[in-house]
Amino acid sequence: MAATAAALAVTDELALPLRAVGDLAAAAGFSREEVVVITQCASLGGKLPFDDASVGSVLAVIKKVENLGDLFITEISRVLKAGGMVLIQSSPSDQDPNNSIQRKLLLGGFVDVQASAASSQDSEHSVTIKAKKVSWSMGSSFPLKKATKGLPKIQIDDDSELIDEDSLLTEDDLKKPELPVVGDCEVGATRKACKNCTCGRAEAEEKVEKLNLTSEQINNPQSACGNCGLGDAFRCGTCPYRGLPAFKPGEKIALPGNFLAADL
């Protein structure tokens, strides 16, 4: 048996009418002499003696629908070339087998499945179901075109009013701040603040004066009761040294650097 064929006609009967072979040849665009005919296909056990993808078109004239099983549909798909056509002619019955045959073809991977009246004058084969094998082969691949999504365009309204930030500033805001001169007092040996003091020395001297201490009391502290140098816990209520750290009589009192700072 030939391993390839332009067209193949199979039937489960003993013979196949010539006009059925002619219909297949005309539909597939071949001459009748190019069609290979196989009768009693049920005896083949669902196998066809052809190579894979070696037949251009297949005509199956099936009298008994049970002979057109899933295995036989798969075998037809195997021997058909990509894009090949299959025509199935079956006898009408009360159970309407057309829908079941169409369903088998769809499940077998065929496309464009259509049912129509047969052109043959044989009343026993009056229904023809036409289908087509997909145009791509098993295992073939092709690139997919990915849709490129561009960034959304921002619509800028040129008519919108923009506020100039500089217009929100006043003349006073634009002036540079004048920093006070540090240590502008012309102090001498006594280190006293000048009349127009702006460095903060005058305020510091005012805080010292509030303690009611003279410079002699700070430089040479003395205690009449003997408890002034021991600290506030031992000083009387009128002690001029209240609030100062403990000291030794005759020793100069050293005030801490933050002593005159205001308590927060």
Curated annotation (Swiss-Prot):
Subunit structure: Monomer.
Organism placement in taxonomy: Eukaryota, Viridiplantae, Streptophyta, Embryophyta, Tracheophyta
Motif (Cx2C motif 1): 225-228
Binding site for [4Fe-4S] cluster: 225, 228, 236, 239
Essential cofactor(s): [2Fe-2S] cluster; [4Fe-4S] cluster
Domain of life from the UniProt record: Eukaryota
Pfam families documented for this protein: CIAPIN1
Family statement: Belongs to the anamorsin family.
InterPro entries found in the cross-reference section: Anamorsin, CIAPIN1, SAM-dependent_MTases_sf
Protein role: Component of the cytosolic iron-sulfur (Fe-S) protein assembly (CIA) machinery. Required for the maturation of extramitochondrial Fe-S proteins. Part of an electron transfer chain functioning in an early step of cytosolic Fe-S biogenesis, facilitating the de novo assembly of a [4Fe-4S] cluster on the cytosolic Fe-S scaffold complex. Electrons are transferred from NADPH via a FAD- and FMN-containing diflavin oxidoreductase.
Sequence intervals crossing the membrane: none
Keyword vocabulary terms for this entry: 2Fe-2S, 4Fe-4S, Cytoplasm, Iron, Iron-sulfur, Metal-binding, Mitochondrion
Stored Gene3D superfamilies: Vaccinia Virus protein VP39
Name this protein carries in UniProt: Anamorsin homolog 2
Record flagged with keyword Transit peptide: no
UniProt remark on domains: The C-terminal domain binds 2 Fe-S clusters but is otherwise mostly in an intrinsically disordered conformation. The N-terminal domain has structural similarity with S-adenosyl-L-methionine-dependent methyltransferases, but does not bind S-adenosyl-L-methionine. It is required for correct assembly of the 2 Fe-S clusters.
Region annotated N-terminal SAM-like domain, chain positions: 1-142
Fe-S binding site B, as annotated region: 225-239
Ligand binding ([2Fe-2S] cluster): 185, 194, 197, 199
GO BP terms, alphabetized: iron-sulfur cluster assembly
Stretches the record annotates as Linker: 143-174
